[in-house]
């Protein structure tokens, strides 16, 4: 039997089983106690199977913690509708369907290091580093005279993701991108 935890003791980053045995990652947790009632715990969670983010209320509940496995792997290649990753320790490979990587695929390139999250043998998702360097496949030409504060132009990365970048970025440059919101952070210097 897995460890049980009181709802009011939940912390960001913990994983629990939800009311319908879904695997939930705790994002935020607030505990409100009034004089005449039992405390209410409002918890913002992400369903690791569906990706849905919702608020759930608990009242004095004991919840079952879920022990998830995290394994560092390297992206090798895309095979049709699947992304293939390899464990650098034992060279085992796994395939993850593209539909399970809707956001993450924008930042995965050859040799990208990721953390695969699983429960028992079920792949739940991929964690990316917060910032990743990635090459610009195409950048629009800078418009001469357009030097207003924070002038931007469109660019497409080698992954196919499009975003706004500063005017000085050119095709072939490597830039650092936030995997949280997909925004440009800086020119990659290495």
From Swiss-Prot:
Coiled coil: none
Chief site of localization: cytoplasm
Family, per entry: Belongs to the elongation factor P family.
Provenance organism: Mycoplasma pneumoniae (strain ATCC 29342 / M129 / Subtype 1)
Protein function: Involved in peptide bond synthesis. Stimulates efficient translation and peptide-bond synthesis on native or reconstituted 70S ribosomes in vitro. Probably functions indirectly by altering the affinity of the ribosome for aminoacyl-tRNA, thus increasing their reactivity as acceptors for peptidyl transferase.
Matches recorded under HAMAP family: EF_P
Places the protein is found: Cytoplasm
Gene Ontology CC annotations of this record: cytoplasm
Pathway: Protein biosynthesis; polypeptide chain elongation
Superkingdom of source: Bacteria
Molecular function in Gene Ontology: translation elongation factor activity
The name this protein goes by in its record: Elongation factor P
Record CDD domains: S1_EF-P_repeat_1
GO biological process: peptide biosynthetic process
InterPro entries recorded: Elong-fact-P_C, NA-bd_OB-fold, Rib_uL2_dom2, Transl_elong_fac_P/YeiP, Transl_elong_KOW-like, Transl_elong_P/YeiP_cen, Transl_elong_P/YeiP_CS, Transl_elongation_fac_P
